[in-house]
Amino acid sequence: STFAQYKGLDVVKVANSQQPYINENIHIPDIEGYKTLKCDFHTHTIFSDGTIMPEERVWEGNRRGLDAIAITEHIEYRPHNSFIKADHNESYKIAKGVEKNANIIVIPGAEITRNKPLGHLNALFLKDANALDIEDPLIAIDNALEQGAFIMWNHPGWPNDTSTIYKVHQELIKQKKIHGIELVNGFEFYPIAFNFCKDYNLTYMGNTDIHGVYNQTYRTDRQYGPMTIVFARERSIEGIKEALFAHRSVVKFGDMLIGSENNLKALMKACLSYKIKPVKGNEAIMEISNKSTLNSV
């Protein structure tokens, strides 16, 4: 018997019983003059209302093939605070600790979490998230801006399935205090928000807003986890920040690509190659190859 064969051994390790390490292996080539970076700018951990630890969220990003991930805990909503005793910067600090080994850029952020009409906004590239923990959300936005933050208006169609741009948003956009809109969040797409981005010259954003375990939430066989594709001068937090403020982004949502005409053209040019084979006379065959793993190309 198998037991008889193992009898007398101290330890028997059965490696085949372990969950295999599977990477989504999403390949998107660099566009001309810029590096193409795959990013998720909206995630949560147990330090707000998520269910996993910050370091595991980073490793999930690694397995997804991301170049960057932002840790954006709710400022006002922390249901685990009876046993998670920490300030608003702690989850980022923990995530940052595995950044090098996971080979992924960890971006500090936070989510200002208020009811509509203001709604939820992510502040990215923060130096101190604690400065946002105040009663007046508009002052919280100003405090984030003083730190050089990029402000993203999150899921405009949630929770009432109506994407309304209220007066407060118009004023913030006019004052250059909102820089991008999350027109894809998780499983939802807000088509009218595409018009907001276009009309107000804002950055197109799409993210998971993941709270649970990624591979228990999204179909990994079809690359359905949304992401923001960023065209940066360099693979660094500074490069990503500059690119977002310069509106160099495209949203990937399942098989859809969403963005400005210029950015989409640049991406298609990088992904597709053409070869013309003469046949006879004036006839020829054009072969088009997809150099990416994007299903929409």
Predicted regions and their residues:
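A metal-dependent hydrolase metal-coordination microenvironment
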Residues: 18-147, 154, 163, 176, ...
